[in-house]
Every structure is written in structure tokens, then in C-alpha cells.
């Protein structure tokens, strides 16, 4: 994997989604992705509203030492940074951490990413946190 594998994320995005326990879209937000330090890091600055809960996050992503993906730290203002991972295979992007994994399909033109956050198999206790999410480039 190269640092360019996640370049599809560069730019500004609008996020919409629906919790699996909701009967209507209950997730909105924005995400902006930029390169830092001569391209060595990818920064994701996000804001989400999930129901009535507002979430702000800053994520720093870099190629991991094994060359098999990307490591990330997410800072959300609620304590120590959280460890996440990213990978991309063709038109599929994966973002995983804290017992949940997002698998998204990148549209042919790169303007939409549609997917679902699901609990990892060993984390059935996270089932109520599952949600569908669509990112549209703005």
C-alpha cells in the first residue's frame, strides 16, 4: 500500500446515515481530508450529529510499518487517542477500530462512498452501534 491509496478521501465530504435501530436518517456530518508533512500524513477533520449527540474528531493516518495498510489515531476530545486501521482494495475501503468495521464502496467517479459500520464478529455487544453511512463529495 502507498500513501496514495487513500487519496480518494482528499477534499470535503457530506455524510448522511441511519442507525440500524432508527426508522429514518439520524446521522449527518462533514469530513475534510488534507495531506500534512509533505504528504506523509492524512488528516481527517470530522463533525457528526448522531441523533442529538454531536461528535468532533481529528484523525491522523499514516502507512503502517508492514506495508499492508494504514494506522491511525483518532482524537475526539474524550481522552487518549483511539487506535484505528485503514485499508483499500480496488474500489473497497475499510476503516476499523474499537470493535467496529466500516466497509465502503467507492463510486466509479470517486464522488460517493457508500457502506456500513458493523460490529466485529467478537463484539456482539456493539450491535446497536451499527449504522449505514454515505459520503458525498462537496
Language model features with spans:
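Short, well-ordered, mixed-charge alpha-helical segments that flank or form enzyme active sites
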Residues: 81, 104, 122-126
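A short, Trp-centered hydrophobic/proline-enriched beta-strand micro-motif
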Residues: 10-16, 114
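Beta-strand/loop substructures that line and gate deep hydrophobic ligand-binding cavities in soluble
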Residues: 111-118
Amino acid at each position: 500500500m502507498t500513501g496514495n491509496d487513500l487519496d480518494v478521501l482528499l477534499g470535503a465530504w457530506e455524510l448522511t446515515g441511519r442507525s440500524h435501530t432508527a426508522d429514518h436518517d439520524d446521522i449527518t456530518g462533514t469530513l475534510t481530508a488534507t495531506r500534512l508533512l509533505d504528504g506523509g500524513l492524512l488528516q481527517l477533520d470530522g463533525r457528526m450529529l448522531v441523533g442529538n449527540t454531536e461528535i468532533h474528531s481529528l484523525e491522523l493516518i499514516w502507512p503502517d510499518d508492514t506495508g499492508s495498510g494504514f494506522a491511525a489515531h483518532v482524537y475526539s476530545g474524550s481522552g487518549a487517542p483511539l487506535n484505528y486501521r485503514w485499508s483499500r482494495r480496488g474500489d473497497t475501503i475499510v476503516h476499523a477500530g474499537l470493535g467496529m468495521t466500516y466497509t465502503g464502496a467507492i463510486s466509479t467517479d470517486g464522488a460517493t462512498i457508500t457502506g456500513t459500520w458493523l460490529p466485529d464478529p467478537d463484539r456482539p455487544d456493539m450491535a446497536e452501534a451499527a449504522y449505514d453511512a454515505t459520503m458525498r463529495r462537496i
